[in-house]
Amino acid sequence: MRAIEDGPVPPALDEAEARAFLRVGAGADNAVLASLLASVSALAERFTGVTLIRRTISETLPVAPGCWQALGRAPVNAISAVEGLAIDGTTTALPITDYAIDIDARADGWVRVDRADGFGRLRISYTAGVAVDASGVPEGLRQGMLL
């Protein structure tokens, strides 16, 4: 069973840019605008299959010794931890000799565990995202989210 925890999707549009496009003044309800920006960002990520704003992601995968497993979010910037996950929820860092990681040319992340004695699941921590902030999101995507 695969589970991905990455928290709320950060807005992939700058609030000032959205206000200007929508012709909404500074007196408009900030909470409503923030909610709309978060919603459109999440929809854009689901539609494109791309993580727009860089963030840390924690993913749980089954142990499959010797098999490469793809991570669920892309583009992957870095894989920072591979841990064995015990039934009680505690994690233990696996020795680097017991696993391999790879980020391919398409920025898909991969993990292969050779040994995970006593663990039925893995917790992988990694960073994924196209841009550090909204200004780095490609123009075409930003335009699409505004429309």
Describe the predicted segments one by one.
Residues 1-147:
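Divalent metal-cofactor coordination and adjacent catalytic microenvironments
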